Regions:
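Glycine/proline-rich active-site loop of Rossmann-fold NAD(P)-dependent oxidoreductases
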Residues: 141, 166-179
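N-terminal Rossmann-like NAD(P)+-binding domain of SDR-like oxidoreductases, especially those catalyzing
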Residues: 1-166
Length: 179
């Protein structure tokens, strides 16, 4: 989702800064595959959203934060729930606090349909009860609630997106739809 968002924002003429986790290969993930006219217009910064001072510094002079950083493997969340809390909850808190301190115009929180658990009614609406069926889902619920609290407590403009079963180009084979 993030690589498609970056591509679209660049094509619309926006300045884009993205934070990617440092890795030994210095890989930028899907950004490495972008055409030069897109890739050369992205400011890429390697770092960790769990580093509060780093995030505060890197979000200065930013108008909108699209927060997509998260650990997402549901099965692995059972093996390492602490890492999910650290990245998905504390990382989100760092992003929200930086947005507040740097007077960001809008904070877009990317969540997941997993926050609803098994559907209790169809169609699922925003009024559907939240039900964490995995440590991953619990961290995303916590992240969403933190975002809402920053709206309610600090009037930080927040938008929460909860995508369902995304698919398409650049899709991870982990989430491939069988044919």
């Amino acid at each position: 989702i993030g690589s498609h968002l970056i591509e679209k924002l660049i094509k619309l003429g926006h300045q884009v800064k993205t934070i990617i986790p440092y890795n030994i290969d210095n890989s930028w993930g899907w950004i490495d595959t972008f055409k030069p006219e897109i890739k050369n217009n992205i400011e890429v910064v390697s770092g960790d959203i769990c580093d509060q001072n780093f995030i505060l510094d890197e979000t200065k002079k930013i108008d909108i934060i699209f927060h997509l950083a998260a650990l997402i493997s549901i099965p692995y969340s059972y093996k390492s729930p602490q890492s999910y809390v650290s990245t998905n909850v504390m990382g989100t808190l760092n992003m929200l606090e930086a947005a507040r301190e740097n007077n960001v115009e809008l904070f877009v929180q990317t969540s997941t349909s997993e926050v609803y658990g098994s559907s209790q009614f169809i169609p699922i609406t925003e009024k559907h009860p939240l039900f964490a069926q995995s440590p991953y889902a619990a961290t995303k619920i916590a992240s969403d609630q933190l975002a809402l609290s920053y709206f309610n407590s600090f009037e930080l403009p927040v938008l929460i997106l909860r995508p369902f079963n995304t698919f398409g180009p650049r899709q991870s084979l982990r989430a491939a739809i069988p044919t």
